[in-house]
């Protein structure tokens, strides 16, 4: 399997674990190709759609630091309200854009 596909699957798996730890109900679409990688539902009935991406950074000389490379949502993803989930495979950190609201526990 292509390394990028493998890393994509790892990112989705880490995202699923992250969302489960937030006490969300988590689902994955059957289709391998589509605008959404992961669907999550809160106990209050709120639905969240995610596109999982491997976190990538670029060095910005003017700032002297690395900065996340933000991916662009497709027009369909924008219409659906998909959130981008950047996953760091090495640290298992997940950064969601736009951020999730404070979830009740």
What does each model-identified segment do?
Residues 55-83:
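Short, charged, amphipathic alpha-helix that recurs within catalytic cores of restriction-modification
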Residues 1-29:
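Acidic-basic catalytic patches of nuclease active cores, encompassing PD-(D/E)XK
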């Amino acid at each position: 399997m292509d390394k990028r596909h493998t890393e994509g699957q790892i990112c989705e798996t880490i995202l699923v674990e992250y969302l489960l730890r937030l006490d969300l109900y988590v689902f994955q679409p059957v289709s391998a190709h589509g605008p959404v990688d992961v669907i999550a539902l809160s106990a209050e009935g709120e639905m969240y759609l995610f596109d999982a991406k491997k976190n990538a950074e670029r060095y910005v000389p003017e700032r002297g630091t690395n900065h996340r490379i933000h991916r662009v949502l497709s027009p369909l993803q924008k219409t659906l309200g998909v959130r981008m989930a950047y996953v760091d495979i090495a640290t298992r950190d997940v950064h969601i854009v736009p951020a999730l609201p404070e979830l009740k526990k």
